[in-house]
Regions:
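Conserved helix-turn-beta segment immediately C-terminal to the redox Cys motif
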Residues: 32-49
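Thioredoxin-like thiol-disulfide oxidoreductase module
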Residues: 45-64
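Thiol-/selenol-based redox modules, centered on thioredoxin-like
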Residues: 85-90
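Generic recognition of short, well-ordered alpha-helical segments
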Residues: 30-33, 60-63, 80
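Local sequence-structure signature of Cys/Sec-based thiol-disulfide redox active-site neighborhoods
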Residues: 6-37
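A short, hydrophobic beta-strand/beta-hairpin element that forms part of a small beta-sheet core
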Residues: 65-74
Length: 90
């Protein structure tokens, strides 16, 4: 059996928490507020990335934003739970 290709975007490894987002997306704004609060409380590095700034991200995630990655792995799509994120960072 051939190995499965890693489809995780390179940007997901840019910080401990990465949120792929888009301007004008209300769910993105909610996710960013949660990430800013939870990461601020724990001192965790995080990064927001605009899905429309990169063709590869746009083609993969355009219908799924916000997408949150923790430690380089997809953690949530659309709705981010603050308690679940907090637990993942401890």
């Amino acid at each position: 059996m051939a190995p499965v290709a890693d489809t995780t975007p390179e940007v997901a490894h840019s910080a401990r928490v990465v949120v792929i987002t888009r301007d004008g997306c209300h769910l993105c704004n909610e996710a960013l507020t949660i990430v800013e609060t939870v990461c601020g409380q724990s001192g965790t590095e995080w990064l927001a990335v605009d899905v429309d700034a990169d063709e590869t991200l746009r083609s993969t995630y355009t219908d799924h934003v916000p997408v949150t990655f923790v430690d380089g792995r997809e953690f949530s799509v659309w709705v981010l739970d603050a308690d679940r994120l907090r637990a993942a960072l401890t």
